[in-house]
Amino acid sequence: MCIRDSYYGALLSALKKYDKAIIEYGKALDKDDTQVDLWREISDAHEMNNNYAEAIAAYRKYYDALAKEKKTPETLFQLGRLYYGQGTSSDSLAVQPADRKLALQSADSVFTLVSEQAPDSYLGEMWRARTNSAMDPETTDGLAKPYYEKVMDMLLSKNEPKYNSALIECYSYLGYYYLLKSDYPTSKEFWNKILAIDPTNATAKKALEGIK
């Protein structure tokens, strides 16, 4: 029975036996290919194995099989997150530099669509910022700057404490960006903004000490 196979697959995933779980999910799909949610489970299992290429392939099958009304910004976001995971993977053997760059470019494209589909949410722009930061790890080109600035403006307009950690991320990037540009007054403004939220923030304190 396909239900038994899918249940067994879920059990194996819970036991962190991801390779075996993928086999059982595959058996269930062979018996009933309308169980599109199983592609998501297969994707999750591959991700837990740090096999992002297979995770992305499985998730794309899941997403493509969804009815139009289920293709929400949230389901699309997960695809972008997988591309981001591949692009920032610490496994240099599994992910080659060319694949890493392509994955980050794909992540940026997906998060752009998320932003367009959910313009009132900051998450699409935040993940565009993170993705562009990963493409510019030394912050030499400031690729993430416009996205962090946009997120900052969006969150300041909401004026809610639950966004403080995201604001600190924005301020940290911008503070470092202006520090590299030797624009010390502007850099100090951002580090002080962090301390206004979190007076014990060690990174901000260290940056300000260095500017002095």
Residue ranges and their predicted role:
Residues M1-I3:
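Short, small-residue-biased leader/transition segments that mark boundaries at the very start
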Residues A10, D44-E47, R81, G85-T88, ...:
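Residue-level recognition of tetratricopeptide repeat
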Residues L15, N49, Q86, K101, ...:
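Structural motif corresponding to the intra-repeat A-B loop/turn of tetratricopeptide repeats
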Residues K27-A28, K61-A65, V114, V151, ...:
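Canonical positions in the second alpha-helix
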Residues D33, A67-K70, P119-D120, P199:
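Short coil turns that delineate tetratricopeptide repeat
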